[in-house]
Amino acid sequence: MAGALGCSPLKSRPGSSARVAFVTANLVARVSDYRFEMAHWGDQHKKTVAATDAAAWGVICREIAATGFQAVEIWEAHAAPEVMNRERGATWKAILDEHGLKAIGYGGSLSRQTLEICQWLGIPQINGSIGDNTPGQAAAMCREMGVRFNVENHPQKNAGELLKVVDGGNDWLGVCIDTGWLGTQGASGPEVIRACGPLVRHVHIKDVKAAGAHETCMLAEGVAQVAACIATLKAIGYSGWYSWEDEPEDRNPFDSAVRNRHWLEKQLA
């Protein structure tokens, strides 16, 4: 492919923002009645893959659209390489279209298989782990497939550690800032954002109650400095998407989706 898949602006519904997306990983606990422990994420992933057929995907998309979101970032478990094919991809895309949702990102691990899924669904970027690939291998695959990759911070505590994963970044490799994980690591989100500068190509907006753990909470009610992070993103000229992320272990994230969307849209206004 000559260039990256497009990510054109959406026509906003009243009261919505075309730059705000719903991360479907928010529904990690859906298969266990919205109760789970973060340490068992892998088990939830497997159960979600098994539970997500076309009917289940349709219900998920309908519920997301009902909260006013127009865009989604699809968690790998909802469109997993082990079960997806071109035909299924076309079905998933048709369901998204039916509910007025645009897939703007894929949250998962970089591989030829996940890049292919992005092609089927019209997704321009993968945000997550570089997997077993070297930066050179990753850039070559992304260039060939026309889909970008952004490494998401989890253990990293500063920009140097993050940029090392993508060998400083390039046209195809960048950074996805996860404000919640920076809060968990006790890092300064604004400082990391400033240091990464134009290599920040995507953002997961999440808040956590305290450093040292990953207990998510309402935006602006935790320690992740989300308002300051957004202000810094504006200051460096970031114009990409803001994916709202909240993977609660003991509640249904749909209950707070509208509140958090409104808060985020107000910050971006």
For the regions a language model picked out, list residue spans one by one.
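Active-site beta-loop-alpha junctions enriched in small/polar residues
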Residues: 25-27, 75-79, 108-110, 131, ...
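Extended hydrophobic secondary-structure segments
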Residues: 69-82, 169-184, 190
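Generic structural signal for well-ordered alpha-helices
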Residues: 57, 61-62, 89-93, 111-115, ...
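N-terminal pre-domain/capping segments
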Residues: 1-113, 119-125, 160, 261-269
